[in-house]
Structures are given as C-alpha cells and as structure tokens.
C-alpha cells in the first residue's frame, strides 16, 4: 500500500497456486468453492479470504503449478545460491510467465520472503519430489 501511495504507477502482481481462490476472487469478486482443491505449494494461495490480504492494491494474480514452484525453488538454490522456500520459486516462475507484460525500461522487484530450511524434507528432497511426480 505504501509503495502505491508513493508512486501510483507501481504494479503489484500476486502469485497464486492452483487450488486457491485468490485469482478468481480478485478477477470476479466471487468466492468459488469449485476452485478449492489440495495443493502442495506452501506460503501462497488460500481456501479462505484472510483479512490481511488487501485485494484493492493487487493489480493481478498469476497462477503457478505446484511442480513449477518446486522446480524453480530448487533452481534458485542451484543456479543462484539462494536457499529459498517454495513460494519463492513460485514468484520467479510467475514473473517469467508474466514477462510479456513488461517493457525493457520496467524495474522489477521480487520479494523472496522465505528460507528453504523448512523445506529440506520436501522441495530439497528427491524422494519427496518423485513422490509428487515433480522429478522422474
């Protein structure tokens, strides 16, 4: 909210997961129970509308699959040395999906707000990744 107050041209893009109601609710104002199903991406998405989400300042939501979130989280660690949580991989993948909306002169800030320490047994575990069919 503060950033938009300082510069109304700032765009805030939220990343959502399949199985969450945020994107559809943001676009239509409808809380659709049919959008809700289990997902493994922790830290994003909801099957409720929390009071701490101010939908009025979010310009759009982009959906990212659980598999893409997990793979991009691991890629952050491997390629960039960033030991991040699963929602961080989702944020990077979501940005890549939205890159067509960007101009060369745009400045992009991605918030990576979670450490990978809570995901050692999941995202950073090959057996878990294989059990979810995220790795072969």
Predicted regions and their residues:
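Short glycine/serine/threonine-rich phosphate/pyrophosphate-binding segments
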Residues: 1, 87-95
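Phosphate-binding loop/pocket of nucleotide- and phosphate-handling active sites
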Residues: 38, 93-136
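Active-site/ligand-binding loops adjacent to catalytic centers
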Residues: 4-86, 123-136
């Amino acid at each position: 909210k503060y950033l938009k107050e300082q510069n109304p041209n700032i765009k805030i893009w939220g990343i959502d997961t399949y199985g969450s109601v945020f994107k559809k609710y943001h676009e239509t104002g409808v809380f659709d129970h049919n959008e809700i199903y289990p997902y493994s991406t922790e830290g994003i998405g909801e099957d409720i509308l929390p009071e701490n989400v101010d939908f009025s300042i979010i310009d759009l939501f982009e959906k990212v699959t659980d598999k893409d979130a997990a793979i991009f989280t691991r890629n952050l660690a491997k390629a960039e040395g960033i030991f991040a949580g699963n929602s961080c991989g989702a944020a990077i993948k979501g940005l890549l999906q939205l890159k067509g909306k960007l101009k060369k002169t745009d400045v992009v800030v991605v918030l990576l707000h979670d450490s990978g320490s809570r995901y050692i047994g999941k995202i950073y575990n090959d057996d878990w990744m294989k059990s979810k069919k995220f790795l072969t």
